[in-house]
Amino acid sequence: MTHAIEVRGLSKSFRADRKALDDVTLQIAPGEMVALLGASGSGKSTLLRHVAGFVTGDAGSGEILVNGRTVQRNGRLARDVRRVRADIGFVFQQFNLVGRLPVITNVLVGMLTRVPKWRSLLRIFKASEVQAGLDALAQVGIDDYAFQRASTLSGGQQQRAAIARTLVQNAQVILADEPIASLDPESSRRVMSQLAQINRTRKVAVVVSLHQVDVAMRYCPRVVALRHGKVVYDGPSAALTQQMLRDLYGSEADELLHDSVPEAPSCAEGVPAPVMVRMDLAAA
């Protein structure tokens, strides 16, 4: 089976004495919805940026493939990485919209890798492409704002516009880096519901880094947890316990849990045991 995302032995050092990523290996299947959990500085955002090909790993370190095509190997981007990136939608924490441009124009930017270069430079789109953008905005529930400046939208609406951009891009993999970090609870619910719906209806892999444990458990069947750049847990979100999360988050845990995770749940019928690695935070 070709994995939607495959990471093999990836390391990244920003300083000689500290690795942001430490020999990370994981596979994500097409159609999975996976949460990345971990305390601030654990490596979640860094991992997503490597998968997207925005940055490279240490020289001689690891390999990343998306849908079987190489993004980077041994610290060097693949020659055709631009083509691979065309299949990767990225939702940023800070929305990454141009406030002075209409919402529809921001959404159609998702097509730029698939249109002739001269049209991408001039931002000229066919009527059929504009309609596809309007359809994407309708899918996320903000088509009424299509021709307003992006700066007039609320934070939640701007994030939904960013999700619409991945739809017109026809992304096969969606990476979302803390997409609800600055949003109110209702906006957060709408954004996560949209990502979950896209995952279900389009069968694309969605990987979302989160700080909210309860949100991860509600929307993501699988969790990958990082600590100090290492994968310390990879398994069902339903199998997480408060003790595991206290070990993962340390002093932040009580603020994050809010009684959303049982102390020691028994595995529900049909819920597999954690796979690949076990929680061993004392050694991490």
Swiss-Prot record:
- ABC transporter domain residues: 5-253
Per the record, a Pfam family?
Answer: ABC_tran
Q: Name one GO cellular component term.
A: plasma membrane
Going by the UniProt record, its keywords in alphabetical order are:
ATP-binding, Cell inner membrane, Cell membrane, Membrane, Nucleotide-binding, Phosphonate transport, Translocase, Transport
Supply the SMART domains for this chain: AAA
Q: What class of enzyme is it?
A: translocase
* Binding-site list for ATP: 38-45
Per UniProt, subcellular location reads as: Cell inner membrane
The enzyme's E.C. designation: 7.3.2.2
Its UniProt entry gives the catalysed reaction(s) as: phosphonate(out) + ATP + H2O = phosphonate(in) + ADP + phosphate + H(+)
- Does Nucleotide-binding appear among the keywords? yes
Reading the lineage from the top rank, the first entry is Bacteria
Please provide, alphabetically and separated by semicolons, the GO molecular function terms listed in this UniProt record. Answer: ABC-type phosphonate transporter activity; ATP binding; ATP hydrolysis activity
Query: Topology relative to the membrane, per the entry?
Result: Peripheral membrane protein
Function, as annotated, reads: Part of the ABC transporter complex PhnCDE involved in phosphonates import. Responsible for energy coupling to the transport system.
Similarity annotation? Belongs to the ABC transporter superfamily. Phosphonates importer (TC 3.A.1.9.1) family.
Assembly: The complex is composed of two ATP-binding proteins (PhnC), two transmembrane proteins (PhnE) and a solute-binding protein (PhnD).
What protein is this chain from?
Phosphonates import ATP-binding protein PhnC 1
